[in-house]
């Protein structure tokens, strides 16, 4: 499984590059519970932080506790959050992973093609959208301190909503 994750990460990094469009590409993906969600349903007219991840990603596991705190502090102000898994082989790990960490984000089940569709270079990749699906900001990877920029961008987006 880790080999598959490494291969996918390398394949994503080496794939031809196509920039994020001004508007986020529409999608319909399944939740862990098996329900389908489209981009408009996910947005619900709110600023939304989308994160592409997989459960054994060490950088995701470093970032997400901090991102969860940012979400908790801003959800009552209108922030939505959704995480999209990009490694199908790890889908069976997600429910226990989410529960053990206390994460509350809506989690959608993506695929390698989803990673390619959105030109992902690494995980986590965070994309901040306005309520209409316009890309306000994108950030790939995580290093300590990045959460401050994520929070700053969210505050900017919420002040415009």
Predicted regions and their residues:
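Thiol-/selenol-based redox modules, centered on thioredoxin-like
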Residues: 128-161
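Bacterial N-terminal signal peptides
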Residues: 5-15
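Short, internal strand/loop/helix patches
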Residues: 97-132
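Short pre-active-site segment immediately N-terminal to redox-active cysteine/selenocysteine motifs
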Residues: 46-48, 53-56, 122
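A short beta-strand-turn-helix
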Residues: 27-48
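Sec/Tat signal peptide C-region and signal peptidase I cleavage site
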Residues: 15-21
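Hydrophobic beta-strand anchors of alpha/beta hydrolase catalytic cores
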Residues: 49-50, 81, 126
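Structural microenvironment flanking redox-active thiols in thiol-disulfide oxidoreductases
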Residues: 61-101, 113-117
């Amino acid at each position: 499984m880790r080999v598959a994750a490494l291969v996918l990460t390398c394949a994503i990094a080496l794939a031809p590059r196509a920039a994020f469009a001004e508007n986020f590409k529409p999608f319909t993906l399944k939740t862990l519970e098996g329900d389908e969600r489209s981009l408009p349903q996910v947005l619900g007219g709110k600023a939304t932080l989308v994160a592409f991840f997989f459960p054994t990603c060490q950088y995701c596991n470093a970032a997400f506790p901090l991102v969860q705190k940012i979400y908790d502090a801003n959800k009552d102000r209108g922030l939505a959050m959704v995480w999209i898994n990009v490694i199908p082989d790890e889908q069976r790990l997600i429910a226990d992973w989410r529960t053990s960490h206390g994460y509350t984000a809506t989690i959608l089940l993506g695929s390698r093609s989803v990673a390619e569709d959105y030109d992902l270079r690494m995980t986590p990749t965070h994309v901040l959208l306005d309520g209409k699906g316009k890309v306000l900001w994108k950030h790939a990877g995580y290093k300590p301190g990045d959460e401050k920029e994520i929070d700053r961008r969210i505050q900017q987006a919420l002040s415009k909503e």
